[in-house]
Structure formats: C-alpha cells, structure tokens
Amino acid sequence: MTGIISTDVLIVGAGPVGLFAVFELGLFDMKCHLIDILDKPGGQCAELYPEKPIYDIPGWPSISAQGLVDKLLEQIHPFKPDFTYNRMVSSLEKLEDGSFRVTTDENEVFEAKVVVIAAGGGSFQPKRPPIPGIEPYEGKSVFYSVRRMEDFRGHDLVIVGGGDSALDWTLNLQPVAKSVTLVHRRPEFRAAPDSVNKMYAMQEMKQLEFRVGQVTGLTGADGQLSSATIKGGPDGDIEVPCTRMLPFFGLTMKLGPIAEWGLNLHENLIPVDTEKFQTSVPGIFAVGDINSYPGKLKLILSGFHEVALMAQAAKRIVSPGERIVFQYTTSSTSLQKKLGVVG
C-alpha cells in the first residue's frame, strides 16, 4: 500500500482538548497528526461561539473561545503537529504489530501506534427550526452560530430559543444590534437563572423585547430578511423587524463511524478508565466530552487533566521499554529546549 501517512499518535478531533493533547504528548517526544471534520482547528469553540467568553480556564479570568484556541496553537507550535481538515475518520484496523491503520472518508490512510479520540460529541450540525421558507435565507441573513459579532451590528436581530445559547447571545449582541427581539414559546427558560434575570431586567429598561410565541413566517427577498411573524403570544400575530435571525434549536450530534470501532459505547459516549483514559481497546484513548467515567464533568479543564495522564500511558506504547522520567517544565532544561524557551 502506498501513500500511508505514519505518525506516533493520531488524534481524532482538533478542539481545545485535542490541541492540548499535542502539548502533553510532545513533551514525551511523540509526533502527532490531527484529523478534524471542520476546516480549521478549535472544534465547537471556533465554529459555534468564537467570540463567547470562557471564565473557567486557570490563569485566564476571561478569554474568548477563539482566543483560547489561538493560545493553544501558540503553545503547541514547537512540536510542529500535522493537521488534516475536512475529513471524517471512517474505518480502523488493528495491525499485527499492535499499531492502527485509520482510513478517512477521502480514502487517506494513516498508521499510528496510538489513537486518541478527542472528538467532543462527534460531528455536529444545528437543528433547523420548523419555520416555513427559511432555507433561502440561511447563510445570508439566518445564521446558526455567531462567528463575528460585527456581522450583526446595526441589524434588527431576532433570536429564537430558550437555552443558554439564545440567552447568552441576546445579552452579548444587544449592545451591537439596532434592536433585539428574543422569541421563546413559553416564559420559562432552560438557561442560567442569572442570564434570564438579566434579560428580563433589560426588557424592563426597554433595551430589548421578549416575545412569547413562535416564529411562523419570514418576509424578505434575495436571501435578505426584512421581518418575521410571531404567533401564539398574548398580542396575537405580530410582525417584527428582522434583518438577521439566530435560531438556537440545539445541535444534532453524530459520532459517525467511530461508533463501529468496538469501543463498548454507552449512550454514545466511550467508557474509559481514570488512570490512563484508555478505552476497551488497548492503544486507543478517549479524552474530553467524548468519554465517560464516574464523576465525569464535561469541562475543557477536565479534558486538559485527562490528556496529561493519557500522554504518560501513550508513551509506554510508543516507546516500550523506555524509562519514563517525570519532569517539570519549570525546572527541566530538556523540556524547556523542546519548548524553545532556552537555547
């Protein structure tokens, strides 16, 4: 077979946890190649909410999702990882020597001694709301994520939904948009109480509108919205100005072919041990939101902890028989040389 791409560790998923795995593995001199279904690194952080602030990363009282991705890319730069984007892993085969052969949906073939699954919830796509005639406006004036807040400046914005994303963007985009109308089918929300209270306070100050009901119609031309019809509220059918719309009806998460890899999935999650974060298949590890174990918290912080322990176990597979010496980056000259901070 020709055209095989060989590496020490193949990482499936280039979100924050997959990126930090490169750092921890790199400290042990393991070469990494990352595959992601998106067209860039960062996972959901970069694709769905790049400008959304994150508050629970140690040392960063507040950092945007894209800012975190950028810092991680800077941090792993000394290890020169390889990336393959716009690809889904399709098949996995364990070879006689214990290594793995992974094929993508474009028939690219990778071989690695270790496979790390850091695929979050798998591939995802937003759920389309049941609004008649929405398709021609998608990508032009109807969007399912916020990549740049500036894209909404000066627009009459209608946000539809009752979860955290809907409330967060209602609050964050209110200073930018010309007007903001939040639409939810009932006055109760599935969002953080503090966000709900802030929204109601802003409504009292007439800084935004909240309408109980459902969007049942759109008006516009050539992909550009001009208004939206809301039905079901106490005022009957009303038409509100709308030049931008953000529907938040959740995501459809698909694990894809990984589900067929014999990893004893439970509720679409991969069970792992908490010593090495290894799956039921030796040599395959799962870190981040994709894994499951008692006490699991779906936090980026938890994923960072998991990859630190995973890297030690991966090193024993990649370099069997080699003595592993635990070192601190603060005091180890050899590690500091790898990071490029000393000559």
Curated annotation (Swiss-Prot):
Cofactor notes: Binds 1 FAD per subunit.
Reaction(s) the record says it catalyses: 2 reduced [2Fe-2S]-[ferredoxin] + NADP(+) + H(+) = 2 oxidized [2Fe-2S]-[ferredoxin] + NADPH
Keywords: FAD, Flavoprotein, NADP, Oxidoreductase
Pfam families assigned to the protein according to its UniProt record, in alphabetical order: Pyr_redox_2
Molecular function in Gene Ontology: ferredoxin-NADP+ reductase activity; flavin adenine dinucleotide binding; NADP binding
EC number from the UniProt entry: 1.18.1.2
Any coiled-coil regions, as ranges: none
Catalytic EC class: oxidoreductase
Signal peptide: none
Top-level division of the source organism's lineage: Bacteria
Binding locations of FAD: D36, Q44, Y49, V89, F124, D289, T330
Cofactor annotation: FAD
Subunit note: Homodimer.
Family: Belongs to the ferredoxin--NADP reductase type 2 family.
Protein name: Ferredoxin--NADP reductase
Organism annotation: Mesorhizobium japonicum (strain LMG 29417 / CECT 9101 / MAFF 303099)
Organism lineage string: Bacteria, Pseudomonadati, Pseudomonadota, Alphaproteobacteria, Hyphomicrobiales
